[in-house]
């Protein structure tokens, strides 16, 4: 515990918590202070100027990060017939229909993302209480309910991430790994910011992107001067 506390103090001393850093400087600091023995994820938190109590101000979507996520993604596809064959050919790890639904009901959930063809939703709809709490329920708003299963699979494998504002109006997202260089992380963040701007509710008033902070898994949050990048 003493070693952990000492390490934490050393990290904190390198970061001025009252300062707003440029995106590049913030990323450099996050990389410098990510000293765990594993490749820490780099995470971002963005406060949005939305009223989460209003149904027309829900911010949700997906974006393919140009530098990827640094994580291998296992994709399950609910489809049958030609769509099932397309999914297999596109590199899906698991493909099935009612048989896959039964495996999920039995607790066999060995995938990171679920995609469904529209006709499969009559089967997938029964799995809401199982997949929903795990963030795995296919949804057309993030492109995981689609007739184009090939493109959905390719996007998932290429580093697509989903985002959604929480009850406090904050979007949390992993944008890479500490082993990524600064430019790769910057490109991923810019892609996310662009996607968030495109998802801005028309009824949102005032400043939309309000605050931004970046951290590694075991690190300390670094505040970013987001006004220079939005």
UniProtKB/Swiss-Prot annotation:
GO annotation, cellular component aspect: cytosolic large ribosomal subunit
UniProt entry tagged with the keyword rRNA-binding: yes
Keywords: Repressor, Ribonucleoprotein, Ribosomal protein, RNA-binding, rRNA-binding, Translation regulation, tRNA-binding
GO biological process annotation, one example: translation
Keyword RNA-binding belongs to the record: yes
Signal peptide start-end: none
Domain of life: Bacteria
GO molecular function per UniProt: rRNA binding; structural constituent of ribosome; tRNA binding
UniProt family annotation: Belongs to the universal ribosomal protein uL1 family.
Role description: Binds directly to 23S rRNA. The L1 stalk is quite mobile in the ribosome, and is involved in E site tRNA release.
Quaternary structure and interacting proteins, as annotated: Part of the 50S ribosomal subunit.
Protein name per the record: Large ribosomal subunit protein uL1
Designated gene of the protein: rplA
